[in-house]
Amino acid sequence: MSTGKIIQVIGAVIDVEFARDNTPKVYDALNVVEAGLVLEVQQQIGDGVVRTIAMGSSDGLRRGMEVKNTNAPISVPVGHGTLGRIMNVLGEPIDEAGPIEYTEKRSIHQAPPAYDELALSTEILETGIKVVDLICPFAKGGKVGLFGGAGVGKTVTMMELINNIAKEHSGYSVFSGVGERTREGNDFYYEMKYSNVLDKVSLVYGQMNEPPGNRLRVALSGLTIAEGFRDEKRDVLMFIDNIYRYTLAGTEVSALLGRMPSAVGYQPTLAAEMGALQERITSTKTGSITSVQAVYVPADDLTDPSPATTFSHLDATIVLSRQIAELGIYPAVDPLDSTSRQLDPLVVGQDHYETARAVQKVLQRYKELKDIIAILGMDELSDEDKKIVDRARKIQRFLSQPFHVAEVFTGNPGKFVSLKDTVASFKAIVNGEYDHLPEQAFYMVGSIQEAIEKAKTL
């Protein structure tokens, strides 16, 4: 094990000098023994000097400190021992529940599976959330992105998806908290504990207060644990909150390493870094990884390079809209902007496909008529258009739904609506079977039966 010494410290970037014939490889993990800190090699500068990124706080480091090369990349424990535990980027427990028992450790840097090992799946995962199941269904082994600006409900929608799928799902789940609030990580842990599914979930946290090197690697640590379960012939759910913070950590690291920034100040390696992560989140013939990723949209601009780069990797995109959130409709999913590769008659069936398209057609027509209504009022519309507006407003309200995870805030018990009920209900609304009910009856209910009951009390 070769040793070197620190020659420069600039925030999270630390230069270490080794003997020329013992220069560490890129991605090797180095140990600063005295400070108990792990560094990861990012660049070889020459003359035995390597530039590294710290995985923890660099407070208290000084020049001349001894650094040991482990001759291997950062490795994390995989397997059953990680279930029910909270780990950091290095796979060390941070839940004060003793050491993690493991039989295997894996490097967090892995090559994606070979092309001939990949497997496709068209089996639909039922989420119990009406708007998701109807407009943007997702498949087992698929990748789903939850896009939204600040405060439109990404984390709550993701928690509901975890609640609904992880409880029904017999396999294991891995949750990677990348640069998010520590409070949310804490809430999530207790939510899982309360739901009795903690023994099927591995948690890896690198929250907002961590240095950029930590946040850049914590998604890979979580993914490595998920790959471990997949290679044991299991179906795994992988949740990442938030992919944007992964990109942002890359931007910080890139600037610290002195790279020239590209568009909007992002790192020049944005597409490559995103690809390295996303290409590994895939299903093979042994098992599947179904991933749900929250993606923060800076200033509600979907053309920003970070969300735009993420789009190309996903099978389904759930776009949360501030305009819909302002109407008090939650989940604030935009049914005209959200898409899914699975919304195909060959996958979901003709009935589901036609109902979803009919719903979108009615909502699109309502959107076009809004300007006319604003200027001239409802009375100037034709009878046909008046009907469309009436149905669209009912559909819009019926797309709202009380969540199980939000019950503590709203006092409304959460509702799980089966896919069959969802399709039948929307089909009936589009066909005008509920034209006689007031639109308020459709707001924040589960099934159509509840809307009928609610109408009686109005």
Curated annotation (Swiss-Prot):
Q: What is its main location?
A: membrane
Q: Which cysteines are joined by disulfide bonds?
A: none
- UniProt membrane topology term: Peripheral membrane protein
Sites binding ATP sit at: G148, G149, A150, G151, V152, G153, K154, T155
**Gene3D superfamilies annotated for this entry?**
2.40.10.170, Bovine Mitochondrial F1-atpase, Atp Synthase Beta Chain, Chain D, domain 3, P-loop containing nucleotide triphosphate hydrolases
Q: Which UniProt keywords apply?
A: ATP synthesis, ATP-binding, Cell inner membrane, Cell membrane, CF(1), Hydrogen ion transport, Ion transport, Membrane, Nucleotide-binding, Translocase, Transport
Q: What is its EC number?
A: 7.1.2.2
Q: Which GO terms describe its molecular function?
A: ATP binding; ATP hydrolysis activity; proton-transporting ATP synthase activity, rotational mechanism
- Reaction equations catalysed: ATP + H2O + 4 H(+)(in) = ADP + phosphate + 5 H(+)(out)
Give the superkingdom in one word: Bacteria
What InterPro entries does the record point to?
A: AAA+_ATPase (IPR003593), ATP-synt_VA_C (IPR055190), ATP_synth_F1_bsu (IPR005722), ATPase_a/bsu_AS (IPR020003), ATPase_alpha/beta_chains (IPR050053), ATPase_F1/V1/A1_a/bsu_N (IPR004100), ATPase_F1/V1/A1_a/bsu_N_sf (IPR036121), ATPase_F1/V1/A1_a/bsu_nucl-bd (IPR000194)
SMART domains in the cross-refs: AAA
Where is it localised?
Answer: Cell inner membrane
Q: Which GO terms describe its cellular component?
A: plasma membrane; proton-transporting ATP synthase complex
> Its function?
Produces ATP from ADP in the presence of a proton gradient across the membrane. The catalytic sites are hosted primarily by the beta subunits.
Q: Would you identify the family this protein belongs to, as annotated? A: Belongs to the ATPase alpha/beta chains family.
Task: Spell out the subunit comment.
Answer: F-type ATPases have 2 components, CF(1) - the catalytic core - and CF(0) - the membrane proton channel. CF(1) has five subunits: alpha(3), beta(3), gamma(1), delta(1), epsilon(1). CF(0) has three main subunits: a(1), b(2) and c(9-12). The alpha and beta chains form an alternating ring which encloses part of the gamma chain. CF(1) is attached to CF(0) by a central stalk formed by the gamma and epsilon chains, while a peripheral stalk is formed by the delta and b chains.
Instruction: Write the protein's name.
Output: ATP synthase subunit beta
